[in-house]
Amino acid sequence: MTIDEVQKLIQGIFDNIFNSVTSAEPGGKPVMTAATTVLSLMKPGMAINSADFRNPWTPGNVNGSQDAAINTARLVDVAPKMSAIYTDSGNTISQVYKQILDGVCIPAQAPNPAIEKQLADADAVLYRTVDMIDPDTGESVPKRIETQLYRDYLDNQAAYNAARIGYIGAYLEAQKTTSGKNTWPLIATTLQLPVRQAYDRWRSGGADRVEQAMAIINTSSQNALQKAFDQAKKTFEGYGVALDDSGTGMSTPIQRSSLLPSNWHSTSSTGWTSFDSAASTVATSNTSDYKSYGGSAGFNLGLFSIGGSAGHTSQSQHASAETTNLRISFSYTLVTIRRPWLTFNLLGTKGWNLGNLFSRGKVSAGGKANQGSSVMPLLPTSFVVVKDVMISASWSKSDMDLIKSKTSGGGGFAIGPFSIGGTYASSRSKQTYSAAFTGGTIRVPGVQIIGVISQIVPLCPPA
């Protein structure tokens, strides 16, 4: 199998997933804008042990798993580099965001009581202050969190977007073959039903009221920046929890985050879209981000990854030229990341700087280009989760021997972005997993994250 054949197959997977969120059926609107959306494939993928993320602790679920809450918070806190290959920058989102909140410098603005009242009224629709017990002192302290109305709005919006992405993915897949195009009108109405139901649920839950408040905040914040940043800091602190307490009372709070749907880590989760490289012509684009932002270079080193773990490869190896007819099939879904502690719209406002901390555009250059030295160019908003991964080929003897040894002997092993064996991510017990290999076909158990979809952080700081 040639390098070009491998590249075409991996790019086909990349483009298929990217197009499902940035394209739309005729007359429809894409869920995300291609110019500000980035897909980063992992090499290798991150295998998920459901037990590590099930039933996370929350203030309303004090009997939940604190480890699951910690694992979730850390999973979504990585600040990746601007690349089509998932690369950890070494920074965390919560760390950089806190630095921005602590270091923001805003020129003095004349007070405007009318605007401040408008901002306060809108803010009350989205956030509320509740009393919580400080685990270190036992005292009741005020915490600023989302209102139930706003939380339901965001959850229902995420469910609608997931339904839309599933529908668009099915539509795009159907358009690849003549039979698919011919049968699409027969199944489209049925597939539209969950989309319409999700939309009605989202819009009927006070969406107009929430969006009016959001619009007021987005416009008024520019005229009351200091107040807006002060409120954002209170919200950030309100979601900090001492889950990983060392007993000294000095542990750094963990920013509580969540993933939707709540059973995302299970194969029984809903909203899956199928992909089969043999079912249709694998569509690739000459202008694909895969080629423009490092995907080709990342997988040019070889189809096989040996050793390493999620997103980190120790050694790459090319498939033998004698291996032919490689076929990859899987089902994928997008898992929405919720960080209620992060007020993203503030990063797009003007009229502030970070003094000597970060110069103009150092956090993010605001686009896909010129982000090489940026501290936090991307904000991950979704994980690409897959299940039912099957990989088959007419393997050469050397490749078959390699696969047999790795699926039976343990150790980190991957094909393309798919992890075939190794240690589960986030598992304190260091549990391992491995795929089955029979009759030339590899069957991978469970679910794994093979990519991250991010939004580009606006020019930050703006001055």
Where do the protein language model's features map onto the residues?
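Intrinsically disordered, low-complexity, charge-biased terminal/linker regions in eukaryotic proteins
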Residues: 1-204
